[in-house]
C-alpha cells in the first residue's frame, strides 16, 4: 500500500529534479561560453536560464560573474528586464542601479532607474534622476513628461492650500492679501513655470492633447497671478 504514495511523490518531484538539472546545465553553458569569449552565446544561454529559474540565475550572477567584465553589464540588463516584466520593481531597480554605478551619466540607465523608482513609489528620488537626465539631455521625452506633470500637480496642491488658508480669513488685511498674492507669484515661478518649460518640450516632440490642456491651464493661472 505504501508503494503507490511513494510512486506519486516521485512523479511530483521528478519535474523539479529535471528543472534543477536543466538550470545547472544551462549555467554551465553560460560559464563555458564566457570562458570561450562567446559573449553573445553566453547572453542567449543566460536568458534561457532566467526563463527556467530566475532566482538561481540571479545567484549565479552574484557569485560567478566578474563584475568588472564587459559581459556583466549585459547579464545585469537581462535580469533587470526580466524582473521588470515580472513587475518585481524592487529587483529590477537593484539591477538597473548596478548598471548605473558603472555609468553614472548614462541617460538610458538613469531613465530606467527613474522609471523603477516611480513604480516603487519613490517619486522624490525619481525627480532627482529625471532632473539629472535633463542636465545631460535637455529634450529627453520621458524626463520632460514626468517633470512637467510632477511640477504641475505639486503646484496645484500648493495653490489649493494657499487659497484655502486665505479663504479662512474672515476679514483679511492688506498685508495678508499682499502675502497671499506674493505666495501665488512665487509658486508660479518655482513650480508652474518649470512645468510649462517641460511640457512645451513634450509637445514639440509629439502632439499631446493632455499636455496642451495643461499648458492652457497654466496660461490662465499666469493671467490670474499677474492681474
Positions of predicted regions on the chain:
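Short coil turns that delineate tetratricopeptide repeat
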Residues: 54, 70, 104, 138-139, ...
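Conserved structural position within tetratricopeptide repeats
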Residues: 51, 98-101, 132-135, 197, ...
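Short coil/turn linking the two alpha-helices of tandem helical-hairpin repeats
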Residues: 57, 119-121, 148, 153-162, ...
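N-terminal leader/linker segments that initiate helical-solenoid repeat arrays
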Residues: 18-62, 69-74
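Canonical tetratricopeptide repeat
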Residues: 62-64, 78, 112, 146, ...
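TPR alpha-solenoid repeat register
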Residues: 58-60, 75, 109, 143, ...
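Short coil/linker segments at helix-helix boundaries
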Residues: 58-70, 153-198
